Amino acid sequence: MKAKLNQFLHKPIAAPAALAILITLAYGILTPQMGFYWDDLPFAWILRFFGPAEFIEGFRPFRPMLGYIFAVTTTLFGGHPLTWQILGLLTRLLLGLQAWSLLRKVFPTRERSVLWVAFAFTLYPAYGQQWVAFTHINQELIPLIFLLFSFTITASLLRHKKTSLPLTALAIFLQTLGLFSTEYFFGLEILRFFFILIILTETAADKKEWFKKTTLTWLPYLIVWVINAAWTYSYHQSNAYNSYQISIFSLLNPLTLVNEFINTLSLSGFVVWLSTFKIFSVIDGSITQIIALVILLLASLTSYAAASNKEQETRYEENHATHYWFVLVGIITIFAGRLPSWAAGLPLKIEFDYDRFFVSIMLGASLFIIGLADWILKESRAKLVFLSLVIGMAAAYQFTVANTYRRDWENTQDLFWQISWRMPLLETGTTILTYEFPVQYLSDYQLMSALNWMYAPNFEGRELPYALQYLKTRFEAFEIKADQPINITYRTTTFTGNTSQSVVVYKEGNGCLRVLDPIYNNAETIPGASFYLVDAISLSNPGLILSNTPAPEMDKTLFGEESSHGWCYTYAKAEIARQAGNWEEVTKLYKEAQKAELSPSLPVEYLPFIEAFARTGDMDTAIKLTERTIKGQPTLCPALHTLWNRTTSDTDLSQAESLLQKECK
């Protein structure tokens, strides 16, 4: 068995197989349970209602060349979330193989180090957006594939000492596709210069000749790079452009530059690898942590086995030169990759969604960390063990990130099922306002596409029937008042509405969706909530909800199977019955929930049932639920006082008043 394994590990297929295993462990285990995230959702909506060609016009104000990539890929692969998740895995495998192939041509005597770089590049822990697949495959990863392929052709021509006009033209064409489709990789073209420089060190007679030949070889690509820089800058300054503005000149302060250098290098070169250890900072024995530990072991063993069987030059001179190049080129590439986001004034953080900027940094950061390991640990078993653990931790960390995406998609689907239960249909032109929904990887504009998908499954035209807005990001405090226009440009569509035609909703963590209003779900029922949300309650008009219509037909591809009819289903139906003044129905719903052994996650969800039992004469149950609510959340005492005062004409308040005076101090 051991002999067969060793025989396999020496075959050319061993390294690609190791990459495939690592990608599966880190990114692929939860693939069937993943969905759409961030801009995936509006892109899927555009594809569903307008078709692939719409991306060309949709990207014109942002990245005019990128729309063509979206148009081609969506024509070929459609818009199913599982398809894009699988394509994401294949794309990462292709990128890992490209990096490995390219670096083998540049550093042919450093097979082992090059493989470590490919592993680190593939699992780089700071880039946590693998599962935003629809967006990032098209927006960044395909352009990066073009650029790395272009580098590989250049390196291959130099290695074979060939001058081929067709291959050079192909390399320039791929460079053009990689640079002009997105600004993310603008700075990475400098890598080609250094790769040419490194390869030519082996044959150059003297430094002057070496540098001259390097420059001449790079010249055609340099011309394209300069043209790209001029085009990018001019387009960003034109009236056609509508996105981030270039602000590099305001950042050319010496102290700012030094601070950026230290922050970027420390964050991308060191902190990102140390951050992987936080998944075991607290040993809780959870299933996620156990699986992560298994992945750590399997990924470490896989990378150790694959790398230990690679032959590597061990002469000091060769090692020393390669360490120098790895570290130097790594540092330069880190800052070249940071340049576009830095020029736009965007921060570099290991958090969603700023971590997307690491996509142009991760190759340089991988060269840097492997170069340091080679330099410090030399060709020792300690280095093999150390780097195996680094790769294993990166794989385990990425799995834990994947699990947050899985949970978030479940929460998103559940959110829309709750919306459909509570608001089967809305008047056309309605805006849903909320402070923020408890989902991490989708914002209001992305969720707005799903809202229109749900309520307008046969949508045609350019005027959106519904909108969803986060108060925290779309409004200033003084704008939260009646009769304020709401005008939204959403890619190639628009929405025209008014704050007076709004429904204000609130969902707290694991709690149920609630429609806020000045009477039943007023400010007293959301203690501690943002003043943005409190001020918006007066705008909420539940009358815009068409409660007597059938629930919308939910696209199962997007929204999944209907969530179980648990407590939140009961609560949604209770709110509808309360809105209609049908108190008997509210009490009936509670009794059915009791039989099914359902209970709320939050005490505030007892309020409609307390009022219903009080108004229908079941004071014992009303008092019992009131006491339970106070004990669970004392800050609801003002809301309970108001609730019981509302029922004055229908009930005897003596018991309730006694309880409130005793418990609400």
Task: Report each predicted region and the residues it spans.
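Polytopic membrane enzymes that build or remodel cell-surface glycoconjugates and lipids
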Residues: 1-467
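C-terminal luminal/periplasmic domains and tails of membrane-associated envelope-modifying transferases
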Residues: 423-428, 436-665
